[in-house]
Structure formats: structure tokens, C-alpha cells
Amino acid sequence: YVNNTYIVLGTKKGIIKKTSLEAYSRPRANGVIAITVRDGDELLDAVLTNGECEILLAGRKGRCCRFDESDARALGRTASGVRGINIDEDDEVIGMIAYDPKAEDAEAHSLLVVSEHGYGKRSEFDEYRKTNRGGKGVKTLNITEKTGSLVAMKNVTDENDLMIINRSGITIRMAVSNIKVAGRATQGVRLINIREGD
């Protein structure tokens, strides 16, 4: 935890909450409240940050919001958070990333997105312009009937491997370096063949 001073929590309805790690320094046997989740929402992810990261949130409909972590002030443990991305009522957030553009290896990182019908691609972080926290964001994958909705978003490097497991249990593994880097608003390439109903 030496380089991380905050924890950022994200929910499926696009709410984020940044809290100092110090707020969790006195755990109790029955746990501590980390966030008050509103009705109809649920916690999606938690990431550790150094206070100087950028947060990226993406929804199933293919839009991604990138903003400075400093746009969200630190809140107490029981607070419910602030709007991170503005999504439609029938949409939900599928991924949250904390990216440090000042890190030594920042150039080596790219954003990987995968759709429900097995399409995916990598894009440079610079392809995603910064927007205000709570905005609609920009298109991250060209969502079509062929691609299906967005299901995953990850911060990757060429040294990483990607594993995809479908509902019927078929697993494929590939080197991230084999997935070409493409523009932000393209549909990507087929990573796995998905059968009807899978």
C-alpha cells in the first residue's frame, strides 16, 4: 500500500467514491462500511490509487468516460459517492480502471475492451479524450448487432495474457500482444467464436 493512498469504489449505475485508505486502518471483527449503495445499484469494482490517476468507466452500450481522479474529492466511509459517468436507465457500467499517466511504464499500457459476441480490441489511452466527471463519455467500441454489448474493459500491456471463458465453459488464452491496437470507435476483431445462446 506504500504507493497507494486512496481506494476508489465504482458501482454499476456509474457512481464512484474515493476514500483515504487511512479510513480503513482500524478494521472491526464484523467489518466496516465502505460505501452506502443506493437501491437498485451494486458495487462493481474497487481500485487503489495514488491520488494522481485518471479514472475510466465504461458502460454496456460502449461509451467510456475518462476524468482526473482529483475531480472526485475524498469522502467518508459511509457516503454514497458522486456521479462518475452518466448512463442511460437501461445501461450499466461494466468496468472501471485507474490509469496513472505519469507512471514510468505508462506508454506500455493500452485499453482492452471485449464485447459479448467475442469481439475485442486494444486502443491507446490517448484516444480517449478527457471529459468532465459525470459526463456521457466517448464511444469506446462501435456496438452493433454483430458485436453485442460491451462486457469487459481492462488496462493491459504486451506482457499480459488474456483469458476468455464463455458460459458453456470453453476457455481460450492468448497473448495481449497478438491483439492489434485499433482506433477508439472501431468494432475490433473476433477473439472467440460464440455460439447462439452462449
Residue ranges of model-derived segments:
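Short, structured "edge-of-domain" segments at secondary-structure transitions
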Residues: 1-198
